[in-house]
């Protein structure tokens, strides 16, 4: 899980979702998981 000020999809399988008011990227590739903040 990477924590970044700006989250962007890295590949075509990355999905941007909102959980508990936080923007997150979830993906099949665990290296692409990101959290904003």
Swiss-Prot record:
GO CC field: cytoplasm; ribonucleoprotein complex; ribosome
GO BP annotations listed: translation
Keyword Ribosomal protein: yes
Xref: InterPro entries: Ribosomal_bL36 (IPR000473), Ribosomal_bL36_sp (IPR035977)
Keyword list, A-Z: Ribonucleoprotein, Ribosomal protein
Organism domain of life: Bacteria
Pfam families linked to this entry: Ribosomal_L36
MF annotations from Gene Ontology: structural constituent of ribosome
HAMAP family: Ribosomal_bL36 (MF_00251)
Protein family: Belongs to the bacterial ribosomal protein bL36 family.
Protein name: Large ribosomal subunit protein bL36
């Amino acid at each position: 899980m990477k924590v970044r000020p700006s989250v962007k999809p890295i590949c075509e399988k990355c999905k941007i979702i909102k959980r508990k008011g936080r923007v997150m990227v979830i993906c099949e590739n665990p290296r692409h998981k990101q959290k904003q903040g």
